[in-house]
């Protein structure tokens, strides 16, 4: 018996893990936006959830967060870690999965990286290279 041709999965994981990650992202963002976690740090910060990455077996969710303004990142991560069990239970109620995934919280570094690249592109050395050269006419 020959094996069936396997479909190639999209970059970043299988379609199912991407879909589950997006459902969890929406659930966490909704919980935080509605003030579902009673914590002074989380209540005093607007926290965005730009991405959730799932392990292939869907048992681990790495949740990338960013406090608006980029301040108190460590405090926000610590508060989320402290309320991890509550959030896991809420996610289990909102997302229909066989197992509620273990949660890990990380700061989303993409905003800082984009700002660094933007600053680099605006630097005088790069601007000089981008100016049209008048002696090539």
From Swiss-Prot:
Keywords, comma-separated and alphabetical: Cytoplasm, Ribosome biogenesis
Subcellular location: Cytoplasm
Record-level GO cellular component terms: cytosol
Origin: domain of life: Bacteria
SUPFAM superfamilies given in the database record: Ribosome-binding factor A, RbfA (SSF89919)
PROSITE patterns: RBFA
GO MF, one example: ribosomal small subunit binding
Record-linked InterPro entries: KH_dom-like_a/b, RbfA, RbfA_dom_sf, Ribosome-bd_factorA_CS
GO process annotations (BP): maturation of SSU-rRNA
Entry similarity comment: Belongs to the RbfA family.
Function of the molecule: One of several proteins that assist in the late maturation steps of the functional core of the 30S ribosomal subunit. Associates with free 30S ribosomal subunits (but not with 30S subunits that are part of 70S ribosomes or polysomes). Required for efficient processing of 16S rRNA. May interact with the 5'-terminal helix region of 16S rRNA.
Quaternary structure (record): Monomer. Binds 30S ribosomal subunits, but not 50S ribosomal subunits or 70S ribosomes.
Protein name: Ribosome-binding factor A
Lineage, uppermost ranks: Bacteria, Pseudomonadati, Pseudomonadota, Alphaproteobacteria, Hyphomicrobiales
């Amino acid at each position: 018996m020959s094996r069936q041709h396997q479909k190639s999965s999209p970059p970043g994981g299988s379609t199912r893990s991407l879909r589950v990650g997006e459902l969890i992202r929406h659930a966490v963002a909704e919980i935080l936006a509605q003030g579902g976690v009673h914590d002074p740090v989380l209540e005093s910060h607007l926290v965005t959830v730009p991405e959730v990455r799932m392990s292939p077996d869907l048992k681990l969710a790495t949740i990338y967060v960013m406090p608006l303004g980029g301040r108190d990142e460590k405090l926000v991560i610590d508060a989320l870690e402290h309320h991890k069990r509550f959030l896991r239970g809420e996610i289990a109620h909102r997302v229909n999965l066989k197992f509620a995934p273990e949660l890990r919280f990380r700061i989303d570094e993409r905003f800082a990286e984009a700002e660094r690249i933007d600053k680099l592109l605006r630097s005088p050395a790069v601007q000089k290279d981008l100016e049209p050269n008048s002696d090539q006419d």
